[in-house]
């Protein structure tokens, strides 16, 4: 298997660049890639200190540098070293300049500016952590989204992912012997979304969870017929209350969250200004 070096250079935290690289590499199976991460490259002097590493470990250079001088210097070095260099945001930024009729600011780290959106995200994360696993149902009306599902149906990780996107999320486990609080059926503002999965997959996930905790592997918690009844119970509840349902069986957390966001956006698109969501 061929090993390659991938250099990621950013004038900010590098979070955007890492996500782009991760998404691209996901298209290749068993890729042997050595990543070299260079964040906060904001001066020519800093760049010059990195160049020897590029020379010693030649490979693809992927970068997001908004400063024209630093960007030009990096391209010159890559040409001299015969290294392929890709500006991850160049074409997108250029297209937006044409459509918006204005030039990009060219200042690094603007997406991390501590503005209203930043504080909204922090507030969403705090709310979501405080309303995990059925806790704090008295405040659910303040949520944007409430996720419901049986144990191990990815409620918590999906909630945290959504919180990082700025959504206040509460989640509640559905247990046949313990009905949800009445507040769940009285919510007006939040969108309630049901998460379901195939019983076979759920049994597998629960068994792995018990092994991780060094607990007994043979209990009703992982018994196939019992788990099937749990899933049926949850689906009936979703249907009776006309809640949208997402099957997470073959979805990643990111894919599940994207489906929830789409449902949320569609719901609010149907609401006229000044009205409350139905």
From Swiss-Prot:
<comment type="function">
    <text>Bifunctional serine/threonine kinase and phosphorylase involved in the regulation of the pyruvate, phosphate dikinase (PPDK) by catalyzing its phosphorylation/dephosphorylation.</text>
</comment>
<dbReference type="InterPro" id="IPR026565">
    <property type="entry name" value="PPDK_reg"/>
</dbReference>
<protein>
    <recommendedName>
        <fullName>Putative pyruvate, phosphate dikinase regulatory protein</fullName>
        <ecNumber>2.7.11.32</ecNumber>
        <ecNumber>2.7.4.27</ecNumber>
    </recommendedName>
</protein>
<comment type="similarity">
    <text>Belongs to the pyruvate, phosphate/water dikinase regulatory protein family. PDRP subfamily.</text>
</comment>
<dbReference type="InterPro" id="IPR005177">
    <property type="entry name" value="Kinase-pyrophosphorylase"/>
</dbReference>
<keyword id="KW-0808">Transferase</keyword>
<keyword id="KW-0723">Serine/threonine-protein kinase</keyword>
<dbReference type="GO" id="GO:0016776">
    <property type="term" value="F:phosphotransferase activity, phosphate group as acceptor"/>
</dbReference>
<feature type="binding site">
    <location>
        <begin position="149"/>
        <end position="156"/>
    </location>
    <ligand>
        <name>ADP</name>
    </ligand>
</feature>
<dbReference type="Pfam" id="PF03618">
    <property type="entry name" value="Kinase-PPPase"/>
</dbReference>
<dbReference type="GO" id="GO:0043531">
    <property type="term" value="F:ADP binding"/>
</dbReference>
<keyword id="KW-0418">Kinase</keyword>
<keyword id="KW-0547">Nucleotide-binding</keyword>
<dbReference type="GO" id="GO:0005524">
    <property type="term" value="F:ATP binding"/>
</dbReference>
<dbReference type="GO" id="GO:0004674">
    <property type="term" value="F:protein serine/threonine kinase activity"/>
</dbReference>
